[in-house]
Amino acid sequence: MKIIVKLFGLLCIAGGIALFSSPMIATENIKQETKQYITQFKQKEEKNKVNKEDDPRYLEIEEYNEKIYENHQKDFRDVNSYQSSPISLKGFKDGKFGYIKIPKMNVKLPLYVGASDSHLASGAAILGQTSIPVGEIDTNSVIAGHRGYQGAPFFREIEKLDKGDTITIVNPWDTLEYEVTGIDVISPFNTDAVMIQEGRDMITLVTCHPYRSGGKYRYIVYCTRKGTKPSRKGNESYQLLKTSTQDINNEDNVRRGGALLLAFLFLSALAQEIKFFIQESRYKKRSKQL
């Protein structure tokens, strides 16, 4: 019975270590999944490579981008429309469009068309009724990401981004580099803040704010393609609102501290059991000799 109790205690400590370490495990998992996604994406596009001007997928995207610009994104009002894919994109399996790299956040994620729950659980997603990024003016691709999801970071560290930082979009035809030009915090219903800006080639990152707030506000990062006209948007007063940096740091410190403490307790208990086992073995050996 004593042995069972001790084993149960060790298992509880090991379970605690796994719990506190789960964010690191989740982060590593998403990195491996993204690596596999990118490899498959590159292999597929290399195999089917054609000039973009001759690619039906590209022509369909051009037509769509032009249409929503000309109609002033009139359907960009219904929350459900954000989740659905804006166009069929028959050549893109499961909405896969490429990937996004954000060096300042140490993030590389699959990029999907349509912000469905499944897409957002796997990477970043382009909101329906916003532009698809192919390097054209009069476009603004609004790209959403979770502020952390099941332990993986996704857009959790978005507040690390500053003006001038680079964000890269890799689509089937081009690698497009964008520069952060403005930051703001808005209401979830303020679609006007993320509309297309005439004469500009933009992407806008969006995630919940503050961290673990349940989506009270949206943290917005405006980015303009390098070498093109910068965004008119941005609001320096956003810094007066609550920042999540300290909350994120505190959470990380608690997780690391908890994992280290439990690891110490586990190793101490294990060392004690090993010591007891060795002493007991020696005692039995001496008893036999007598």
Annotate each predicted stretch with a short phrase:
Residues 2-250, 275-279:
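Solvent-exposed, non-transmembrane regions of membrane-associated and secreted proteins
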Residues 240-290:
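C-terminal single-pass membrane-anchor helix
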